């Protein structure tokens, strides 16, 4: 569930850097 919570924050972040987002999400 921690991953899902971080994913929400990830979605809020700029989608310009999708690769970095995925890493930060999980």
Curated annotation (Swiss-Prot):
Tissue expression as described in the entry: Expressed by the venom duct.
Keyword tags: Disulfide bond, Ion channel impairing toxin, Neurotoxin, Secreted, Toxin
Molecular-function GO term, any one: ion channel regulator activity
Keyword Membrane: no
Top-level taxon of origin: Eukaryota
Residues in the signal sequence: none
Record note on modification: Contains 2 disulfide bonds.
One GO CC term, this protein: extracellular region
Locations listed in the record: Secreted
Function recorded in the entry: Acts as a neurotoxin by inhibiting an ion channel.
Free-text comment about domains: The cysteine framework is C-CC-C.
This protein's name: Turripeptide OL57
Record organism: Iotyrris olangoensis
């Amino acid at each position: 569930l921690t991953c899902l919570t971080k994913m929400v924050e990830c979605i809020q972040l700029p989608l310009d850097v999708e690769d970095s987002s995925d890493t930060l999400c999980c």
